[in-house]
A protein has these predicted regions:
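Extended, amphipathic alpha-helical segments that serve as helical scaffolds
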Residues: 70-162, 166-169
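Alpha-helical bundle protein-protein interaction modules that mediate dimerization/oligomerization
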Residues: 157, 162, 166-179, 195, ...
C-alpha cells in the first residue's frame, strides 16, 4: 500500500522541508535520546518526523503535544503512542457497536470479532511500549546508568511490540477477504489504517534511539531476536531449556490431560482454562497420547504455559475449521497461542480440513518468546501462522501446500523439516509467505539448517506440480534460507510472484550456503529484492542471535539452538 505522502506534497510537507535544515542546525544536545534544544515546536516536530512514512500525520500528531521542543525523543514517542491508544480505543468502541448491526452476516460478525481481539492486543502492546520507553534503560539517555546492552534489550522489546501492533491492523482487514466482505472492510479500513500509520510513525522514530539498531548495521535487519547458546536463543531460560530437553518421564507436570480419564482433565482446553492467569512461573501440562478433537486457545492471560506430549503422531490435537465453511483464517487455527513465553514439545497439531477447504490453520502463534521443540504441524494451505512477535522452532516437521508458513513474526526455524504435500490440480506449492508491511518492522522468516523436501504423497508426482520457496504476501516481505538442504522439488526459479510486480523491488529474499539438487541459484528469479548472500556477516544477521534476541530468552527453555552460522 503506498504511503500517504505519495504524489504532490501537502502544506505540512512543505513546512517539514523548510524547517528540517534549521532544526538540524539549531538542535543542541549530547544525543538523540536526551532533550536537545529546538527554537520552536515546529522545528522539533520537523526533526522528529524526518524519516517517517507518513510525515503529515506525524506533524499533526506532534502538534498536540505541549512544549514539544523541550521534550526528549522517548517522551515524544510516548506522546505519539498515547495518542495512538486513543485511536485504538475509539476504533474498538465503534466495533463494539457495529458488530450488533442487523445488516451483518455471521461471517461479518466473526471478522469484526477478530478485529476487536486484535485491537485489544494492540492496546496491551502499546502500553508495554510506553512502559519500556519510560524505563531507566531508555529514558535515562546516554547519561543514565543503563548499559548499551540493557538499552538494546529494552529497545528490542519496543521495536517488537510496535511491529506486532501494526501487524494486528492488517490482520484485522485481511479478515474481510471474502465475497461481500468489502462493504464491511470499507467501513473499518479508514480507522484501522489510521492506527497502523500512527504506529508506523512511532516505529520510525523509535529506530533513532540508541540500542534500536539504527546506529549499527550489525543489528540489522533482524534486530531484536538475540544471541544463541547451546542450540536455543538465550531468551529461553535455563529452567525452560531443561524442560524441553529432559526425558518427559523426569518432569512432574502441573496438570495431566488424558482421553481415558486417567488424568485430571479429558480435554486440553479444560486444562488451559484451569491454569493460573498471568503467572510468572512455568505451568506444565502433560497431554498423554491420544487424538484430541478440539480447538484450543491459549489466551493472553495464560502466560508461561508449556504443553508436553508423548511424541509426534502420538499426542495429536486436531480440528477442521476453515475459510470455505465460514471461518476467518485467523480464527481457523486448531491451536491459537497468544499468552507469552509459551513452550511446546513432542506433539502434533493438525488441521484436517483438506486442500479443498483453502485456508485452514493448524497453529497460530502471537505469543512473544515462544518456542516449539520436536513438534509437527500438519495441514494444507496456511498450516503454520507465525503471526507476530518472537518465535523459535527446533527439530519440527511442517506439512502443507500453499503459503504453509506465513505471518509477520520474527521467527527462526532450525533443523526442521519442511514438507510440501500434493496440492489440488493446477495449484502450486509455496513454502513461505512472509507478511512484513513496513520497512522498519523487525520481522521476517529465517530458515536455517533445515530440510526442504516433498512429502510422500507429492514425491511420486512432483514433476506435475511446481513448488517454490516463497512469495511476497506484503510489500516488504523478508525471508532467508540458509545452510539448508533443498531437494529437487524446489523449482529452479526458486521464488514466485504474488501478483505481477507487487513487492518485487521492496522484498528481501536471500539464500546462503544451501545444498542439494534444488539449491542451485543459476536460474533463480532476477528481482531487485532477491539476492544470493555471499557475506557471512550479512547472513549472520538472520541467525537466532541477531534476529530474535534468542541469546536472552531461549537459554531458559531447554530447547537446543545454534546461536550463529
Amino acid at each position: 500500500m503506498p504511503p500517504l505522502h505519495a504524489g504532490r506534497p501537502g502544506p505540512l510537507l512543505v513546512l517539514l522541508a523548510v524547517t528540517l535544515a534549521a532544526a538540524a542546525a539549531t538542535a543542541v544536545g549530547a544525543s538523540s535520546d536526551t532533550a536537545p534544544f529546538y527554537p520552536s515546536a515546529e522545528e522539533a516536530a520537523a526533526a522528529h518526523c524526518e524519516g517517517t512514512l507518513y510525515p503529515e500525520l506525524c506533524l499533526s500528531t506532534l502538534a498536540d503535544i505541549p512544549d514539544l521542543h523541550t521534550k526528549s525523543l522517548p517522551d515524544v514517542i510516548c506522546g505519539t503512542v498515547n495518542r495512538t491508544k486513543d485511536a485504538v480505543a475509539a476504533t474498538s468502541y465503534n466495533c463494539s457497536h457495529y458488530i450488533n448491526s442487523k445488516y451483518l452476516t455471521p461471517r461479518d460478525r466473526l471478522a469484526i470479532s477478530d478485529c476487536m481481539e486484535l485491537l485489544d492486543t494492540t492496546m496491551d502492546e502499546l502500553q508495554a511500549t510506553t512502559s519500556d520507553l519510560e524505563s531507566p534503560a531508555v529514558a535515562g539517555g546516554n547519561n543514565g546508568s543503563a548499559s548499551m546492552a540493557a538499552k538494546r534489550v529494552t529497545m528490542d522489546h519496543v521495536m517488537t511490540e510496535l511491529s506486532a501492533a501494526m501487524t494486528n491492523q492488517y490482520t484485522c482487514l485481511d479478515g474481510f477477504d471474502y465475497k461481500d466482505g468489502e462493504r464491511v472492510r470499507h467501513y473499518m479500513e479508514s480507522s484501522i489504517h489510521h492506527v497502523s500509520r500512527m504506529v508506523s510513525n512511532s516505529l520510525a522514530m523509535a529506530k533513532k534511539l540508541p540500542g534500536a539498531g539504527g546506529e549499527t548495521t550489525q543489528r540489522q535487519p533482524f534486530m531484536g531476536y538475540g544471541q544463541m547458546a547451546n542450540g536455543f536463543p538465550k531468551w529461553v531460560r535455563p529452567g525452560d531449556r531443561r524442560l524441553l530437553q529432559a526425558p518427559a518421564s523426569s518432569i512432574t507436570p502441573d496438570a495431566v490431560v488424558a482421553k481415558d480419564g486417567s488424568g485430571g482433565y479429558t480435554t486440553v482446553s479444560a486444562a488451559v482454562a484451569a491454569a493460573p492467569a498471568n503467572s510468572n512461573k512455568r505451568y506444565v501440562i502433560h497431554i498423554k497420547a491420544g487424538a484430541y478433537m478440539e480447538n484450543v486457545e491459549v489466551g493472553k492471560s495464560k502466560k508461561n504455559l508449556m504443553f508436553i506430549g508423548d511424541g509426534i503422531g502420538k499426542t495429536v490435537i486436531k480440528a477442521s475449521r476453515n475459510v470455505v465453511d465460514g471461518s476467518t483464517t485467523f480464527r481457523s487455527a486448531t491451536v491459537a497461542v497468544v499468552g507469552n513465553n509459551f513452550l511446546a514439545r513432542d506433539l502434533t497439531i493438525e488441521n484436517s480440513a483438506g486442500p479443498s477447504k483453502h485456508q485452514a490453520v493448524a497453529l497460530r502463534v502471537g505469543a512473544d518468546l515462544s518456542a516449539f521443540y520436536r513438534c509437527s504441524f500438519v495441514g494444507y494451505q496456511d498450516t503454520l501462522y507465525v503471526h507476530s512477535l518472537r518465535q523459535f522452532f527446533r527439530e519440527c516437521d511442517i506439512y502443507g501446500t500453499i503459503d504453509f508458513i506465513f505471518g509477520n513474526s520474527a521467527v527462526v526455524f532450525q533443523s526442521c523439516n519442511l514438507y510440501a504435500r500434493r496440492p489440488l490440480p493446477n495449484q502450486s506449492n509455496v513454502y513461505t509467505a512472509q507478511g512484513r508491511e513496513d520497512p522498519n518492522q523487525n520481522t521476517g522468516i529465517s530458515i536455517q539448517k533445515c530440510k526442504v523436501a516433498a512429502a510422500s504423497d507429492l514425491l511420486a508426482v512432483q514433476s506435475s506440480f511446481k513448488t517454490y520457496l516463497g512469495r511476497p504476501w506484503k510489500q516488504y516481505s523478508r525471508t532467508v534460507f540458509m545452510q539448508s538442504e533443498l531437494d529437487s522439488v524446489v523449482n529452479p526459479a526458486g521464488w514466485l510472484e504474488w501478483s505481477g510486480n507487487f513487492a518485487l523491488d521492496t522484498l528481501y529474499y536471500g539464500e546462503y550456503q544451501n545444498t542439494g539438487p534444488g539449491a542451485s541459484t543459476s536460474n533463480r528469479v532476477k528481482w531487485k529484492g532477491y539476492r544470493v548472500i555471499t557475506s557471512a556477516s550479512e547472513a549472520s544477521t538472520f541467525t537466532v542471535g541477531n534476529f530474535i534476541d534468542g541469546d536472552v530468552w531461549l537459554a531458559g527453555t531447554s530447547v537446543p539452538f545454534t546461536v550463529g552460522l
